[in-house]
Amino acid sequence: LFPILCSFGRYTVPVPVAQTIVARALLGSQFAMPNGMITLGAALRREADGAIVCSFTPYGRVADFVLAQDGDALLLLPCAAAQREASGVHGSLAANLRWPDERIATHVPGAGPLLPTFAAALHAALLSGAMTRVFEMTLKHCNDRIQFGKTLGKFQAVQHQLSVMAEHVAAASIAAEAAFRTDTTTPSLLAAAMAKSRTSEAAVLVASIAHALHGAIGIAEEYDLQLLTRRLHEWRIAHGSEAHWNALIGNSVLASDASIADFVRSV
């Protein structure tokens, strides 16, 4: 599954195919699957008038349903019944969704706590795929672009930036893939947390170096780099940035009697 999810990130698929795969896994074979695309709600809250709100929902503008955690249960909410408001950066498909009446939601017991784990692993894979392509585009640009009589890649400062970028892309990809190395159908919470933390941390650096080395062409609408880097920033904060997941990892370390090395080996 990891290579497939990476490819969705690499080619910036503009519909929640990856989220639908994960949502159907969470709903399980006992549930009658709805027709249409399902995205994962990053947060759910109830308002005083009984309305349900899912803020900054990835792909909320194009999804047919939202699957969100509600304590120990899941809620499946039809987007056609929601009030949608676009959110996120320019060109983002994220949206704030509000359902005036809770009765339209389908209650699915039991799998609620698994959604954040699946979402973290999913977005780590998407980030890994997108970052790999950003690095490849940047490397090609530096090898093709001639400035002051030689290609950009011949300048030592540029080589250093590319090396730093390659290091973070490789580390993020290893962390993301590790979240999928399991004998069970459910990813480990700690492995998913580490994957999302590492990929989110790398996303900012990779995007900034890519735009620094590309110059103005990097933000041109006709050039695909901006499609990828906008999604890097969006996926970085989706379902928790590195700060959120680092807190979970840190609390787990403090609660463990093992040394740091043994703790890492046990994940």
Provide a role label for each language-model segment.
Residues L1-Y11, L115-V267:
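Alpha-helical interface subdomain recognition
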Residues T12-I21, A25-E136, K140, F263-V267:
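FAD-binding core of flavoproteins
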